[in-house]
């Protein structure tokens, strides 16, 4: 892998394939890298900066595909989640030609662990300091001026308290069962991890 800005590829910590194109990021900057060709994990990758797109800063924590039905059929979008809680959503399949910014959205600051973000069907669930949010609801509710409701709303106080206690610790993780029948939200309690369950 060769990156266009000469950053050491060994510093890359994240990878995601969207519409057959591979994206890498380091987790310590506001840039991601994309391949000029599809269906390859190697070769030359071009830097794409997003630092001037948002307003709240932060580094790229995760990149995911998000499917949303906008009324004219389902559209597969690229969601870039920043450590600040800002979410940048793009349509298109090639950053060099047809990328278009759908919008920037604000959620509570995510727990600082990539495993606290997971794909669930066409949606993306994010563990934040105020609850566990489905990004599809964030986008839909923002468009009509409402605040998205967390799927953890019934245990909101417990979640907020736990994040205050161990929010900077490792062990935050969303695990979706193989049959997609259950979702487990693991959180660190000190020496071990305990789950909240969603059926």
Model-derived features with residue positions:
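Surface loop/turn motifs at the tips and blade-to-blade linkers of beta-strand repeat domains
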Residues: 3-8, 53-56, 104-110, 165
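Acidic/polar residues in short coil/turn loops that connect beta-strands
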Residues: 1, 26-28, 84, 130
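Eukaryotic intrinsically disordered and solvent-exposed regulatory patches
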Residues: 8-10, 49, 74, 111-112
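Extracytoplasmic beta-rich repeat domains
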Residues: 54-66
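A short alpha->loop->secondary-structure connector
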Residues: 1-5, 41-45, 96-102
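Carboxylate/His-rich catalytic cores and anion/metal-binding grooves
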Residues: 17-47
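Beta-sheet-dominated scaffold domains
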Residues: 17-20, 64-199
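Asp-box/WD-like beta-propeller blade repeats and closely related beta-sheet repeat scaffolds
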Residues: 1-19, 50
């Amino acid at each position: 892998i060769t990156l266009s800005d000469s950053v050491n590829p060994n510093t890359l910590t994240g990878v995601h394939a969207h519409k057959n194109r591979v994206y890498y990021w380091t987790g310590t900057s506001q840039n991601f890298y994309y391949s000029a060709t599809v269906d390859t994990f190697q070769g030359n990758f071009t830097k794409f900066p997003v630092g001037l797109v948002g307003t709240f800063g932060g580094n790229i924590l995760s990149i995911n595909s998000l499917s949303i039905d906008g009324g004219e059929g389902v559209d597969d979008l690229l969601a870039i989640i920043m450590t600040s809680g800002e979410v940048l959503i793009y349509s298109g399949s090639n950053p060099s030609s047809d990328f278009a910014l759908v919008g920037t959205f604000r959620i509570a600051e995510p727990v600082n662990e990539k495993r606290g973000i997971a794909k669930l069907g066409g949606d993306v669930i994010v563990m934040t300091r105020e609850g566990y949010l489905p990004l599809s609801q964030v986008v839909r509710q923002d468009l009509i001026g409402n605040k998205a409701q967390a799927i953890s709303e019934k245990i909101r106080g417990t979640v907020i308290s736990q994040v205050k206690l161990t929010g900077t610790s490792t062990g935050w993780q969303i695990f979706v069962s193989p049959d997609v029948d259950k979702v487990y939200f693991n959180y660190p309690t000190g020496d071990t991890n305990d789950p909240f369950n969603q059926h």
